[in-house]
Design a protein with these regions (language model features):
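Intrinsically disordered, low-complexity linker/propeptide segments enriched in Ser/Thr/Gly/Pro
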Residues: 1-7, 26, 35, 39-41, ...
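A short beta-strand motif characteristic of beta-propeller blades
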Residues: 2-7, 48-54, 91-96
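Beta-rich, blade/repeat-based domains predominating
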Residues: 8-24, 56-69, 100-112, 121
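Conserved beta-strand positions in repeat-built beta-propeller and related beta-rich domains
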Residues: 25-31, 72-78, 116-120
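A short loop-to-beta-strand structural motif that recurs across blades of beta-propeller domains
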Residues: 34-37, 81-83, 123-125
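Short loop/turn segments that connect beta-strands within beta-propeller blades
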Residues: 39-44, 86-90, 128-130
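Ankyrin-repeat and related helical/solenoid repeat scaffolds used for protein-protein interactions
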Residues: 65-114
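Long terminal segments
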Residues: 107, 117-120, 124-129
Length: 130
């Protein structure tokens, strides 16, 4: 059986989702420039969602990944950067990409590493986290 989970931000343009160790679902929102989190343990209503505006001018968040330490990583296209979001402090760190127009569409990793395939440059970047 499937069900509809409706984010509270109108026309948010969800692109990618990832879950953390607590079962929360993190959502990259392209149109709104938000990083959102849905906690199914809180039900399906608006109070089960939290939203943070990505830093930078006119942000567009495309991909999201949660690492083994529950740090949330997001690809932000308008400012050609990776965002490191700490859910505990609710703070973003901005990591500029080394090449213009990296256009990261998916993020993966393994313990201590975040892998970033750059569709705009045909390179793969790796951020060491450990």
């Amino acid at each position: 059986m499937s069900r509809i989970v409706e984010p509270p931000t109108q026309r948010q343009g969800a692109r990618r989702v990832w879950s953390d160790s607590r079962g929360r679902i993190w959502v990259a929102e392209w149109n709104s420039g938000n990083l959102s989190m849905h906690d199914p343990a809180l039900g399906m209503g608006a109070n089960s969602w939290r939203t943070w505006k990505a830093p930078g001018a006119d942000p567009h968040v495309y991909a999201v990944y949660v690492d083994d330490q529950d740090i949330v990583w997001a690809a932000e296209w308008s400012n050609n950067a990776m965002l490191r979001f700490d859910p505990g402090s609710e703070k973003f760190a901005v990591i500029p990409m080394p090449r213009p127009a990296a256009n990261i569409r998916q993020i993966l990793g393994r313990p201590g590493e975040v892998w970033l395939p750059e569709s705009g440059t045909e390179f793969i970047s790796v951020i060491k986290t450990g």
